[in-house]
Every structure is written in structure tokens, then in C-alpha cells.
From Swiss-Prot:
Its EC number is 2.3.1.-, 2.3.1.57. The modification N6-acetyllysine is found at residue 29. It comes from the Eukaryota. This is Thialysine N-epsilon-acetyltransferase. One of its GO terms (cellular component) is cytoplasm. The active site is at residue 140. It catalyses: S-(2-aminoethyl)-L-cysteine + acetyl-CoA = S-(2-acetamidoethyl)-L-cysteine + CoA + H(+); an alkane-alpha,omega-diamine + acetyl-CoA = an N-acetylalkane-alpha,omega-diamine + CoA + H(+). It comes from Sus scrofa. The lineage of its organism: Eukaryota, Metazoa, Chordata, Craniata, Vertebrata. Homodimer. Acetyl-CoA binds at residues 94-96, 102-107, 133-135, 140. It is an enzyme of class 2 (transferase).
């Protein structure tokens, strides 16, 4: 197989990233929840004060092969803050196209996010996974992550739409 490059996403990658976001949502059986547009990704990730950062995985052609590189995965992350431990990084999405899974590409993306976290002085690297995604759970544990639901009993909550407007009195 040709080599894999993990690099920072560029604004021009947003179309491919959005396609993979939709593929991930379909895999997670949550396609109806994707409301983001390519324009929003450009504005939110590549403006003056980006809300997120993104890494992409590309398969580079072997020397002499006629085709160009092929984007096969991504990891979208942002920085958060813990009142207990300070700077943290949160991996919102990690996705590798099905035909490229099992080749270590997801691990390479995760390791690169860990590098970024350490370079930025983060004390923790957080992520969430659906309970039925056993392969991902096993991968994260193999890489050294602790399952906080098992270890500490945390539940994750979300306010959205009408509940958020009602809460804010708007």
C-alpha cells in the first residue's frame, strides 16, 4: 500500500470533510442530525478565530503511480477547559472510510491529536463513542484511554433547539 499522510486540513478540503461527516453520521445511524454546510465548515474552521481544527488522512500514491492522493479519513477536534486539570483537547469526530479501516489510519489520526494536545499544554485528550461501537471502544482502550462511564459513571447531556431557547429565555 502507498503511504499515509496525516496533515492539517485546508479550507479547500471542506467538501471532502463534509462528505465524510455525512458518511460517519450514516454509520452512526444519525444522518438526520447533520445540519452543517460546507460554507459553515469554511467559516467555523478556517476564519480568524476557528471554532475547530481538523486533520485529514491521505493515501499518497507510490512513486510512478498516475493517480493523485486520496483523502480517506479525518479527525475534527477543538480545545476545551477543565476546572480540575486546565487545558484539554476534545476529538469530536474520527472517521476512516470503511475500505481503509484496519490499516492503522485511525490510530495515526488519534496519535497526531495526542501530539497536538501535548504541544499545546493539554493535560487530557477526551472523546466520546456510541456504546454499540465496540471496535472503536476497544481501539481507544488499547491506545490507553479510560472509559469514564465505566470508571466514574459520567453521563453526557446536550441542550439543543427549543430546550436551549427556553432555557435562555429567547
Amino acid at each position: 500500500m502507498a503511504s499515509v499522510l496525516i496533515r492539517e486540513a485546508k479550507e479547500g478540503d471542506c467538501g471532502n470533510i463534509l462528505r465524510m461527516i455525512r458518511e460517519l453520521a450514516e454509520y452512526e445511524k444519525l444522518s438526520d442530525q447533520v445540519k452543517i454546510s460546507e460554507e459553515a465548515l469554511r467559516a467555523d474552521g478556517f476564519g480568524e478565530n476557528p471554532f475547530f481544527h481538523c486533520l485529514v488522512a491521505e493515501i499518497l500514491p507510490a512513486p510512478g503511480e498516475p493517480q493523485g492522493s486520496c483523502m480517506v479519513g479525518y479527525g475534527l477536534y477543538y480545545f476545551i477547559y477543565s476546572t480540575w486539570t486546565g487545558r484539554n483537547i476534545y476529538l469530536e469526530d474520527i472517521y476512516v472510510k470503511p475500505e481503509y479501516r484496519g490499516q492503522g489510519i485511525g490510530s495515526k489520526i488519534i496519535k497526531k491529536v495526542a501530539e497536538v494536545a501535548l504541544d499545546k499544554g493539554c493535560s487530557q485528550f477526551r472523546l466520546a463513542v456510541l456504546d454499540w461501537n465496540k471496535k472503536a471502544v476497544d481501539l481507544y482502550k488499547t491506545l490507553g484511554a479510560r472509559d469514564l462511564t465505566e470508571a466514574e459513571g459520567w453521563h453526557s447531556f446536550r441542550f439543543e433547539g427549543e430546550a436551549m431557547r427556553e432555557l435562555a429565555g429567547k
